[in-house]
Amino acid sequence: MNRIQLIFNEKWAMAREDYYNLVSLILPSIHSGNFKEVEAFFEKDTVTAYASDLNFVGRWNLEDSGLPSDSVAVIVLEGTLYSWETFRLQEYIAQAAANDRIAGIILWINGPGGMITGLDNASKMISECPKPVVAYIAGACASAHF
């Protein structure tokens, strides 16, 4: 199932108004047959990650071999949480948990919620992570983000 179909067929955990706002952004393109524009809209990453260290300026990839010891993984959840982004979140948590140079994880959150697919697994990964995981709320933390 492609991402456009998922928008209309998945279950959501977000305010109805936020869902309608999302749909109102893509419906004009769908009605005009401009599916490439809609797909491009959903290609934007809403979950990203990097590692940082208090003693050094800069950011590293989570799996960078030059990452300083005792670094912290920062996983950013910005905007609507789509199911494919939840799977990316799970990948980042697994990478951070497996990296001996990463001491803990910060979830930097600002979003209205999103699709519920994969949230149960992501929640389990967070609660069972062998490293400390904390959340920093940088705005909204609603529904699926919570």
Positions of the model-derived regions?
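N-terminal organellar transit peptides
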Residues: M1-A144
